[in-house]
Amino acid sequence: MQDVKTYLSTAPVLAAIWFGILAGLLIEINRFFPDALVLPYV
C-alpha cells in the first residue's frame, strides 16, 4: 500500500490528474458560458 501512495504522489501522476480536472472545468465553463473569451464589440 505504501508503494501505491508513493506512486500516486509522483509529479507526472499529479500533473495528469490536475490537467484532467482543469480541462473538465474549462469544458463545463464553456458549456454554460460559450464564447466567454471573445470580447463583444459594443
From Swiss-Prot:
Query: Which family, according to UniProt?
Result: Belongs to the PsaJ family.
> What protein is this chain from?
Photosystem I reaction center subunit IX
Checking PANTHER family in the record gives:
PHOTOSYSTEM I REACTION CENTER SUBUNIT IX, PTHR36082
Q: Where in the cell is it found?
A: Plastid, Chloroplast thylakoid membrane
Q: Which GO terms describe its cellular component?
A: chloroplast thylakoid membrane; photosystem I
Q: What is the lineage of its organism?
A: Eukaryota, Viridiplantae, Streptophyta, Zygnematophyceae, Zygnematophycidae
- Per its UniProt record, what SUPFAM superfamilies does this chain match? Subunit IX of photosystem I reaction centre, PsaJ
Kindly list the residue ranges recorded as spanning the membrane: 7-27
Q: Which domain of life is it from?
A: Eukaryota
Primary gene name: psaJ
How does the entry describe its membrane topology? Single-pass membrane protein
One GO BP annotation is:
photosynthesis
The record's Gene3D superfamilies line, in alphabetical order, gives:
Single helix bin
Note the Pfam families from the entry.
PSI_PsaJ
